[in-house]
A protein has these predicted regions:
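Short beta-strand elements of extracellular/lumenal beta-sandwich folds
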Residues: 2-31
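Terminal connector regions
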Residues: 53, 60, 70, 74-143
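Generic recognition of long tandem-repeat/solenoid scaffolds
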Residues: 16-22, 56-68
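N-terminal carbohydrate-binding/catalytic regions of secreted carbohydrate-active enzymes
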Residues: 147
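Ordered hydrophobic segments in well-structured contexts
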Residues: 19-21, 34-36, 63, 79-81
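Beta-strand-rich interaction surfaces with strong enrichment in secreted/lumenal proteins
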Residues: 8, 66-71
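Short acidic, flexible loop segments centered on an aromatic residue
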Residues: 23-57
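Generic structural motif
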Residues: 1-10, 54, 98-101
Length: 147
């Protein structure tokens, strides 16, 4: 199993930095592989990628490879960052939405996590139910005659 994490930080302005981490949770190392992702937040022609080779982009499709043919051992994580984004992401699904790895003539599925803000803790969800207060006695019958 492969797992991809996404994070975003607002620097450098105006669109910030997109960071990706691919973790090999499988039982075999990845050798001579590429990572493909689809994302609504695209990398523009004027960009900087650190820790990976940016092979190509076609619309929302992006393909990356490790530097110098590095392999990804079992339990290891490959991290890289990209600057020069089309826009800042606004939602947790604005980074990699789908991903797959091509290795050894096979296409391997990748589980993708939601985008997180790298510079801030995640916001707590709102309460699911309002705080309740009983002002009348509780009735177990569906339609009691009186309370």
């Amino acid at each position: 199993m492969l797992f991809l994490e996404n994070s975003w930080s607002p620097e450098p302005a105006p669109a910030g930095t997109w960071a990706l981490k691919l973790t090999n949770l499988g039982d075999a190392p990845l050798v001579d592989f590429t990572l493909s992702v689809t994302t609504i937040t695209r990398i523009m022609p004027e960009h900087q990628v650190y820790g990976a080779k940016f092979l190509r982009r076609a619309a929302n499709y992006h393909e990356f490879a490790p530097l110098d043919g590095e392999s990804l051992a079992v339990g290891a994580t490959w991290s890289f960052e990209a600057e020069g984004l089309f826009r800042s992401p606004f939602h947790r699904n604005d980074a990699a939405k789908t991903a797959w790895v091509k290795a050894g003539g096979k296409v391997l599925p990748v589980q993708v996590g939601d985008l997180v803000h790298a510079a801030a803790p995640p916001a707590l969800p709102p309460p699911r139910l309002p705080e309740g207060r009983l002002t009348l006695p509780f009735a177990l019958l569906p339609w009691p005659h009186a309370i």
